[in-house]
Amino acid sequence: PILQRELGERFEAPAAFDKLIADGRKGKKVEKGFYRYGAAVKKGRKEVDTSVYALLGIQPSGRLSSEQISNRCMVQMLNEAVRCLEEGIIASARDGDIGAIFGIGFPPFLGGPFRYIDSLGITALVADLRRYEQQFGARFTPCNMLLSMAEEGRSFY
């Protein structure tokens, strides 16, 4: 709620979370959430608690690949990193890369979010964000700095 109040719909929690919390599904510490817990579950494996589907009134509709899942999460994080630079929260792409690696555990072999954006290509990142924006809404809208850099063919390094 705090992030949503300060930053708007980009950080709005899905309505499903309210239903899960109301049902006492707070995860591992209470052994009830999205997944099954306890002795019946093999250690190191995550099994979906299928009763969650009825609670949320949904049916699973296929599987996303690991790559699709990680890409959808990653593009939002990359967009927010650039937004931090755009808003002056960080002074440089280098500061953002160092901060992300040491502060939030961004994979060092990718060089940090800004170095990683350069390796992907800003135009490709903007295209991914636009595609997700069409599917999932404004939380995937590319920030202005990304749009202008893509238009001008610029990079961070």
Per-region residue spans from a language model:
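N-terminal glycine-rich phosphate-binding loop for ADP-containing cofactors
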Residues: 1-157
